Curated annotation (Swiss-Prot):
Keywords: Keratin, Repeat. This is Keratin-associated protein 4-12. It comes from the Eukaryota. It holds the Pfam family Keratin_B2_2. Sequence repeats lie at residues 5-9, 20-24, 25-29, 30-34, 35-39, 40-44, 45-49, 50-54, 55-59, 60-64, 65-69, 70-74, 75-79, 80-84, 85-89, 90-94, 95-99, 100-104, 105-109, 110-114, 115-119, 120-124, 125-129, 130-134, 135-139, 140-144, 145-149, 155-159, 160-164, 165-169. Residues 5-169 are annotated as: 31 X 5 AA repeats of C-C-[GRQVIL]-[SPTR]-[VSTQPC]. Interacts with hair keratins. Expressed in the hair follicles. In the hair cortex, hair keratin intermediate filaments are embedded in an interfilamentous matrix, consisting of hair keratin-associated proteins (KRTAP), which are essential for the formation of a rigid and resistant hair shaft through their extensive disulfide bond cross-linking with abundant cysteine residues of hair keratins. The matrix proteins include the high-sulfur and high-glycine-tyrosine keratins. GO terms for cellular component: cytosol; keratin filament. Belongs to the KRTAP type 4 family. It comes from Homo sapiens (Human). The gene is KRTAP4-12.
Length: 201
């Protein structure tokens, strides 16, 4: 039984046996729970019932195998972009999904509108599409983030002083902050600006 099953030709009747789990038997008909061994991790055996930690190999990176135990660098594929796989080593551009918005995944390639979360507010993610009120942190004060909808007043740092941050109609009220002025914004009701050009102070 063993020789006839675990040789070059595997029969469907005996391939599920415990003593038959050999690399030569890892064919589609052999993908059973009793055959989930490291030596059986081939693409034809990547079934949900075989997705164990021992089967996390590059050839086994299938959507059905994207489980927490399979989140390894060799399994970072677009089909494996699930929330349980959001590890630093899996943060590739193909994995930038809303479910992958973790601090460890906040890299330049992941700076998309779906990833604009407070936990993702890092300097490398300071893009215009991420300049939301939740992302107005000192590390996010970049020229590209100085837009009127999100930069006044919570994001008006010295590095963010742009004319779009100093709206004239509200310069004397809400957004009158000393770190957010430009010559176009200086009016008599505002204090001496710290971010103004010397010619305007």
């Amino acid at each position: 039984m063993v020789n006839s099953c675990c040789g070059s030709v595997c029969s469907d009747q005996g391939c599920g046996l415990e003593n038959c789990c050999r690399p030569s038997c890892c064919q589609t008909t052999c993908c059973r729970t009793t055959c989930c061994r490291p030596s059986c991790c081939v693409s034809s055996c990547c079934r949900p019932q075989c997705c164990q930690s021992v089967c996390c190999q590059p050839t086994c990176c299938r959507p059905s195998c994207c489980q927490t135990t399979c989140c390894r660098t060799t399994c970072c594929r677009p089909s494996c972009c699930v929330s349980s796989c959001c590890r630093p080593q899996c943060c590739q551009s193909v994995c930038c999904q809303p479910t992958c918005c973790r601090p460890s995944c906040c890299q330049t390639t992941c700076c998309r509108t779906t990833c604009c979360r407070p936990s993702c507010c890092v300097s490398s993610c300071c893009r215009p599409q991420c300049c939301q009120s939740v992302c107005c942190q000192p590390t996010c004060c970049r020229p590209s983030c100085c837009i009127s909808s999100s930069c006044c007043p919570s994001c008006c740092e010295s590095s963010c002083c742009r004319p779009c941050c100093c709206l004239r109609p509200v310069c004397g009220r809400v957004s009158c902050h000393t770190t957010c002025y430009r010559p176009t914004c200086v009016i008599s009701t505002c204090p001496r600006p710290l971010c103004c050009a010397s010619s305007c102070c």
